[in-house]
């Protein structure tokens, strides 16, 4: 199992905001963490990545290919991020530096983790921009984040996250800030890239309809605890918890299941 989370806790001061969360992500699996705002899903992801805010402390176990990540030194975690584990945030401005070109930022990830030359990094940046369907990739890599649309910025952030071909992608509500049409395009892009590269995926969302488009299994959280774990098809047709039933009622996007989704 590539990622195994066991009894994960997150404490902020005396308050426990993630309480005993456990789930696994086998190689190549697509697993969704779903819950309302404040359910602990994003903090769970940040704990896995070693990116918790100041004052928050993680406990329990997070094992990546058998290696324990809880308590791992920051330098070693930073090496894993971007190399073995890619990250896409809800708001691409979180990932993109406003005073650096898109190409420099995509290429910088490759230079840091693979040690390539500046010329090779720029070539790779153009390749990755094309891979995420950014228009006119040879020119767009010379632009700054503010010169791109919201959907284009998210594509650029995805290109950065996947430039080094990580084995696991963690995507934290990457489509929430986008309109419905662009949201669908980004979901289809992510699904295609994950399948093409054989990556594992942890996808975080509050929308069961969105989850149904990209994940095969779901972990439902409420108040920091797991209340249900099941295939997404089961969550949609036979939810076992009141929380999941509420998420199903609240789903507003069109439910669509790609061919072959189990």
Segments (PLM) and residue ranges:
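ABC ATPase "signature
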Residues: 229-230
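A short, surface-exposed alpha-helical micro-motif characterized by mixed small hydrophobic
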Residues: 211-213
